[in-house]
Amino acid sequence: MAEQYDAIIIGAGIIGASVGLELARRGWRTLNVDRLPAAGYGSTSASCAIIRSHYSTLDGTALAFEGYQYWRHWSEHLGVADERGLARFEEVGCAVMKTSSNGYLKSICENLDTLGILWEDWDNETLKKRLPIYDLRSFAPAKLPDNPGFGEATGPAIAGAAFMPQAGYISDPQLATHNVQVAAEAAGAKFRFNTNVTKIRQVDNAVRGITLA
C-alpha cells in the first residue's frame, strides 16, 4: 500500500535527520528512509564531529557559525528529552597552523573578522606555551610512510597559528543524530530503517516518489 508524504528524505544521518526535523516543524509530513538499522549509523558515526567556523568562503563561515549556535544550545534546539541522554558539545577551541600552503590563513581570518567571530593570533612562542607537545617544524608536503624523507623536516618553523575559541567537538555524533530523530518524531516525522530504496520515480522530470525493496 502506497504511503503519502510531503517530503521523503533518503538517509538518516545528521543531515538527513535534521532536514526531517526542520520540515516537520514547518508542518510537512516527512519520511526518512535509511538502509542501516538506526539514525546516524553511516558516515555520521565515522565523523570526527568537529564544530568549527573557519572556512574559505564568507558564506560557508556564516553558515557554520549559525550551526555552532545550535550546538551550544542543543537542549533548547531539540526541545524534547531523549531517554538515551543528549550529546555534549565540548567547546575546547581549535588551533590551525599558518603555512604557505594555506596562505597563512589570511582570507580565513578576514572572514572571521567580517562576521565578528572570535579568534586569537598566536605566534610560535604562544603556540609552544599552549601546546607544548607540538613540533613547530614544517614537514610539508605530505608524504607516505614508504616515501624517502618521510618524517623529516622540510623547512623552517611554521608561522604561528590562529586559535578559534568558539569551536570544539561533539561527544557522540551517533547519539546527536538520535537526539535529532527523537525531536523530529515529536514534531510528527516518520523514520524507516533497514529499508533499501530501489528506484526514485519521476514524472515529467519531477520526483513523484520512491520504490522500496
Where are the regions that the model predicts?
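Dinucleotide-binding Rossmann-like beta1-alpha1 core, especially the glycine-rich loop
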Residues: 48-148
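Beta1/beta-strand and adjacent pyrophosphate-binding region of the FAD-binding site
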Residues: 2-15, 31
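Flavin (FAD/FMN) cofactor-binding and adjacent substrate-gating region
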Residues: 101-193, 199-206, 211
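Gly/Ala-rich phosphate-binding loop of Rossmann-like dinucleotide-binding domains
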Residues: 20, 24, 183
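Glycine-rich FAD pyrophosphate-binding loop
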Residues: 24-44
